[in-house]
Curated annotation (Swiss-Prot):
Chief location: membrane
Organism this protein belongs to: Homo sapiens
Recorded superkingdom: Eukaryota
Transmembrane segments: 35-55, 63-83, 89-109, 114-134
Keywords assigned: Membrane, Signal, Transmembrane, Transmembrane helix
Protein's cellular compartments: Membrane
Signal sequence annotation: 1-32
Annotated membrane topology: Multi-pass membrane protein
Gene: TMEM276
Protein name: Transmembrane protein 276
Entry GO terms, CC: membrane
Amino acid sequence: MAPKPGAEWSTALSHLVLGVVSLHAAVSTAEASRGAAAGFLLQVLAATTTLAPGLSTHEDCLAGAWVATVIGLPLLAFDFHWVNGDRSSANLLLGGGMVLAVAGGHLGPEGRSVAGQAMLLVVAVTILIVAVFTANTYGMWGGAMLGVAGLLSRLEEDRLLLLPKEDVCRWALAVGSWAYCRALHTQRLQWE
Protein backbone atom coordinates (compact mmCIF):
# COMPACT_ATOMS: atom_id res chain seq x y z
CA MET A 1 0.00 0.00 0.00
CA ALA A 2 1.38 3.38 -1.03
CA PRO A 3 1.80 6.00 1.67
CA LYS A 4 -0.81 8.75 1.70
CA PRO A 5 0.28 12.18 0.45
CA GLY A 6 1.62 14.24 3.31
CA ALA A 7 2.22 11.23 5.55
CA GLU A 8 6.00 11.66 5.51
CA TRP A 9 5.66 15.37 6.24
CA SER A 10 3.25 14.66 9.09
CA THR A 11 5.55 12.02 10.56
CA ALA A 12 8.62 14.26 10.36
CA LEU A 13 6.74 17.16 11.95
CA SER A 14 5.42 15.04 14.82
CA HIS A 15 8.94 13.70 15.54
CA LEU A 16 10.35 17.22 15.35
CA VAL A 17 7.76 18.68 17.73
CA LEU A 18 8.18 15.82 20.22
CA GLY A 19 11.97 16.26 20.04
CA VAL A 20 11.85 20.04 20.53
CA VAL A 21 9.34 19.86 23.39
CA SER A 22 11.37 17.11 25.06
CA LEU A 23 14.64 19.02 24.61
CA HIS A 24 13.10 22.13 26.15
CA ALA A 25 11.76 20.01 29.02
CA ALA A 26 15.16 18.34 29.54
CA VAL A 27 16.94 21.69 29.72
CA SER A 28 14.25 23.18 31.97
CA THR A 29 14.30 20.32 34.46
CA ALA A 30 18.01 19.43 34.40
CA GLU A 31 19.02 21.29 37.53
CA ALA A 32 16.13 20.34 39.79
CA SER A 33 15.15 16.94 38.44
CA ARG A 34 17.94 14.99 36.81
CA GLY A 35 15.93 11.78 36.42
CA ALA A 36 13.15 13.53 34.55
CA ALA A 37 15.71 15.41 32.44
CA ALA A 38 17.30 12.09 31.47
CA GLY A 39 13.87 10.71 30.54
CA PHE A 40 13.14 13.74 28.37
CA LEU A 41 16.59 13.44 26.80
CA LEU A 42 15.89 9.82 25.84
CA GLN A 43 12.77 11.03 24.01
CA VAL A 44 14.90 13.62 22.20
CA LEU A 45 17.41 10.98 21.12
CA ALA A 46 14.67 8.65 19.88
CA ALA A 47 13.12 11.44 17.80
CA THR A 48 16.52 12.54 16.47
CA THR A 49 17.52 9.08 15.26
CA THR A 50 14.24 8.85 13.37
CA LEU A 51 14.64 12.28 11.75
CA ALA A 52 18.31 12.06 10.76
CA PRO A 53 18.56 10.48 7.30
CA GLY A 54 21.13 7.72 7.04
CA LEU A 55 21.97 7.92 10.74
CA SER A 56 20.19 4.71 11.63
CA THR A 57 18.13 1.83 10.30
CA HIS A 58 14.44 1.21 10.93
CA GLU A 59 15.41 -1.33 13.60
CA ASP A 60 17.57 1.27 15.36
CA CYS A 61 14.64 3.69 15.38
CA LEU A 62 12.39 1.03 16.89
CA ALA A 63 15.03 0.23 19.53
CA GLY A 64 15.34 3.94 20.35
CA ALA A 65 11.59 4.28 20.74
CA TRP A 66 11.59 1.15 22.93
CA VAL A 67 14.26 2.55 25.26
CA ALA A 68 12.56 5.97 25.39
CA THR A 69 9.35 4.21 26.42
CA VAL A 70 10.50 1.62 28.96
CA ILE A 71 13.34 3.61 30.55
CA GLY A 72 12.59 7.24 29.67
CA LEU A 73 8.99 7.33 30.84
CA PRO A 74 9.70 5.68 34.21
CA LEU A 75 12.52 8.19 34.71
CA LEU A 76 9.98 10.97 34.15
CA ALA A 77 7.64 9.54 36.74
CA PHE A 78 10.44 8.63 39.16
CA ASP A 79 11.16 12.19 40.29
CA PHE A 80 7.48 13.08 40.49
CA HIS A 81 6.88 10.19 42.89
CA TRP A 82 10.15 10.63 44.78
CA VAL A 83 9.61 14.30 45.60
CA ASN A 84 6.11 13.52 46.86
CA GLY A 85 7.46 10.86 49.22
CA ASP A 86 6.23 7.83 47.26
CA ARG A 87 9.62 6.17 47.06
CA SER A 88 8.33 2.61 46.67
CA SER A 89 6.31 3.49 43.55
CA ALA A 90 9.26 5.45 42.17
CA ASN A 91 11.61 2.50 42.63
CA LEU A 92 9.05 0.00 41.33
CA LEU A 93 8.44 1.98 38.13
CA LEU A 94 12.13 2.47 37.43
CA GLY A 95 13.00 -1.14 38.29
CA GLY A 96 10.18 -2.43 36.09
CA GLY A 97 11.42 -0.30 33.22
CA MET A 98 14.96 -1.62 33.60
CA VAL A 99 13.73 -5.22 33.62
CA LEU A 100 11.65 -4.58 30.50
CA ALA A 101 14.62 -2.96 28.76
CA VAL A 102 16.76 -6.03 29.42
CA ALA A 103 13.97 -8.46 28.50
CA GLY A 104 13.07 -6.59 25.30
CA GLY A 105 15.35 -8.75 23.18
CA HIS A 106 13.48 -11.85 24.27
CA LEU A 107 10.07 -10.45 23.38
CA GLY A 108 8.59 -10.56 19.91
CA PRO A 109 7.36 -7.41 18.17
CA GLU A 110 3.84 -7.84 19.55
CA GLY A 111 5.19 -8.48 23.06
CA ARG A 112 7.32 -5.32 22.92
CA SER A 113 4.34 -3.36 21.68
CA VAL A 114 2.11 -4.55 24.51
CA ALA A 115 4.84 -4.06 27.13
CA GLY A 116 5.60 -0.54 25.88
CA GLN A 117 1.94 0.44 25.87
CA ALA A 118 1.48 -1.04 29.34
CA MET A 119 4.47 0.93 30.64
CA LEU A 120 3.10 4.12 29.09
CA LEU A 121 -0.30 3.58 30.71
CA VAL A 122 1.16 2.67 34.11
CA VAL A 123 3.33 5.80 34.11
CA ALA A 124 0.36 7.93 33.00
CA VAL A 125 -1.95 6.54 35.68
CA THR A 126 0.59 6.88 38.49
CA ILE A 127 1.40 10.48 37.49
CA LEU A 128 -2.31 11.22 37.32
CA ILE A 129 -2.92 9.76 40.79
CA VAL A 130 -0.09 11.73 42.41
CA ALA A 131 -1.18 14.89 40.58
CA VAL A 132 -4.76 14.53 41.80
CA PHE A 133 -3.65 14.08 45.42
CA THR A 134 -1.26 17.03 45.24
CA ALA A 135 -3.71 19.22 43.24
CA ASN A 136 -1.14 19.69 40.46
CA THR A 137 -3.24 20.66 37.43
CA TYR A 138 -0.37 20.38 34.95
CA GLY A 139 0.40 16.93 36.31
CA MET A 140 -3.21 15.92 35.75
CA TRP A 141 -3.07 17.13 32.15
CA GLY A 142 0.31 15.48 31.60
CA GLY A 143 -0.88 12.15 32.99
CA ALA A 144 -4.10 12.37 30.98
CA MET A 145 -2.27 13.11 27.71
CA LEU A 146 0.24 10.31 28.27
CA GLY A 147 -2.75 8.03 28.89
CA VAL A 148 -4.43 9.25 25.70
CA ALA A 149 -1.26 8.43 23.75
CA GLY A 150 -1.21 4.93 25.24
CA LEU A 151 -4.88 4.31 24.54
CA LEU A 152 -4.71 5.67 20.99
CA SER A 153 -1.81 3.36 20.20
CA ARG A 154 -4.05 0.37 20.98
CA LEU A 155 -6.69 1.35 18.42
CA GLU A 156 -6.99 -0.77 15.29
CA GLU A 157 -7.41 2.25 12.99
CA ASP A 158 -4.42 3.30 10.89
CA ARG A 159 -5.50 6.95 10.73
CA LEU A 160 -6.94 9.29 13.33
CA LEU A 161 -8.00 12.87 12.63
CA LEU A 162 -6.74 12.48 9.03
CA LEU A 163 -3.22 11.72 10.29
CA PRO A 164 -1.39 8.43 10.76
CA LYS A 165 -2.16 6.99 14.20
CA GLU A 166 1.51 7.04 15.29
CA ASP A 167 1.72 10.76 14.52
CA VAL A 168 -1.36 11.52 16.63
CA CYS A 169 0.21 9.51 19.47
CA ARG A 170 3.44 11.54 19.18
CA TRP A 171 1.43 14.80 19.27
CA ALA A 172 -0.30 13.57 22.44
CA LEU A 173 3.10 12.63 23.92
CA ALA A 174 4.44 16.09 23.08
CA VAL A 175 1.51 17.80 24.81
CA GLY A 176 1.84 15.41 27.76
CA SER A 177 5.59 16.06 28.00
CA TRP A 178 5.05 19.82 27.97
CA ALA A 179 2.38 19.58 30.67
CA TYR A 180 4.55 17.23 32.72
CA CYS A 181 7.48 19.65 32.50
CA ARG A 182 5.19 22.39 33.81
CA ALA A 183 3.99 20.01 36.54
CA LEU A 184 7.57 19.46 37.69
CA HIS A 185 8.13 23.22 37.74
CA THR A 186 4.93 23.74 39.76
CA GLN A 187 5.92 20.96 42.12
CA ARG A 188 9.35 22.49 42.65
CA LEU A 189 7.78 25.88 43.44
CA GLN A 190 5.52 24.24 46.04
CA TRP A 191 8.49 22.69 47.83
CA GLU A 192 10.60 25.87 47.90
